[in-house]
Amino acid sequence: MISKDPRSSLPPGFRFHPTDEELILHYLRKKVSSSPVPLSIIADVDIYKSDPWDLPAKAPFGEKEWYFFSPRDRKYPNGARPNRAAASGYWKATGTDKLIAVPNGEGFHENIGIKKALVFYRGKPPKGVKTNWIMHEYRLADSLSPKRINSSRSGGSEVNNNFGDRNSKEYSMRLDDWVLCRIYKKSHASLSSPDVALVTSNQEHEENDNEPFVDRGTFLPNLQNDQPLKRQKSSCSFSNLLDATDLTFLANFLNETPENRSESDFSFMIGNFSNPDIYGNHYLDQKLPQLSSPTSETSGIGSKRERVDFAEETINASKKMMNTYSYNNSIDQMDHSMMQQPSFLNQELMMSSHLQYQG
């Protein structure tokens, strides 16, 4: 342990902010090789026997981050994994290891160490609660291991300085060697899960209080008033067509022969059906197919026969309708009965060859 406070020999305004390369070359490598370090500012502390919030009190120097030399124990007697369990929780590795390299003077970079990031969790795995305490663990690369250096000097095989050369788990982990640890608390990190839930709940309440209250009833009357209008537009029945049509003209039209019927009659009847004052937006122009009168080229016996058939079919259909529904009844009764067959006139018009579709 350090018997003398190193801060007493430091000049005013001194801050200890070493780089990763400086920590490896000037502190960790000398500690592992038992060489004197430049300044006794890093204490020897087994960080796995304490909680991270208790470590700042054990550091001889530091304000927002603290440095320690710490040993590592094996998780299993014959294993190569370190034991990350601490006093009231455990350290968990996060991310990938970072290689620390420096130029060797020959235009190449030599790997001198490895940096690993860990996060402290309260409790036991795997149900630990994440905290804001972070640790950066530095360890020497294989090329700087004292065991490798002594083996090379004693006549052993030459050691490749590349970090990827790993011939033994003992040298790759070297759990019996020292590691350098930097401990700090992340200031703007996410809180633990109970605190996060509490903060999130409070923020939601504050946002709901600041939002203007909108009464849903302000929109409902408009929707309710629009529904009858939509129903009126979409509930046009055959009885409405009869209300818009002269019944006397319809009876005469059915009893007349096709020869005496002119194009003006058709246009008059269709014009009444598509009266915009009654149905609006030319409802029947959209629902009924457009009709055209027979062309002037249609002539001869075949056309006359088709007209006679049309007249007979129309008269028979009208007689059946007259027998079933009497004109002696009121207009309302006729409307009710005709609603049972809303497509009667449409079927007669489509079955007839006298009236054809356009398009």
Curated annotation (Swiss-Prot):
Gene3D superfamilies found in the cross-reference section: NAC domain
Q: Name one Pfam family in it.
A: NAM
Q: Which UniProt keywords apply?
A: DNA-binding, Nucleus, Transcription, Transcription regulation
Q: What spans are recorded as compositionally biased (Polar residues)?
A: 148-165
CC terms in the record's Gene Ontology section: nucleus
SS bond list: none
Region annotation (Disordered) maps to 147-166, 200-226
User: Where found in the cell?
Assistant: Nucleus
Show the SUPFAM superfamilies listed in the entry: NAC domain (SSF101941)
Q: Does the keyword Plastid apply?
A: no
Primary localisation category: nucleus
In the induction comment, the record states: By root flooding. Induced by senescence.
Q: What does this protein do?
A: Transcription factor that binds to the promoter of ACO5, an ACC oxidase involved in ethylene biosynthesis. Mediates waterlogging-induced hyponastic leaf movement, and cell expansion in abaxial cells of the basal petiole region, by directly regulating the expression of ACO5. Required for normal seed development and morphology.
Q: What is this protein called?
A: NAC transcription factor 47
Organism in which the protein naturally occurs: Arabidopsis thaliana (Mouse-ear cress)
Q: Which gene encodes it?
A: NAC047
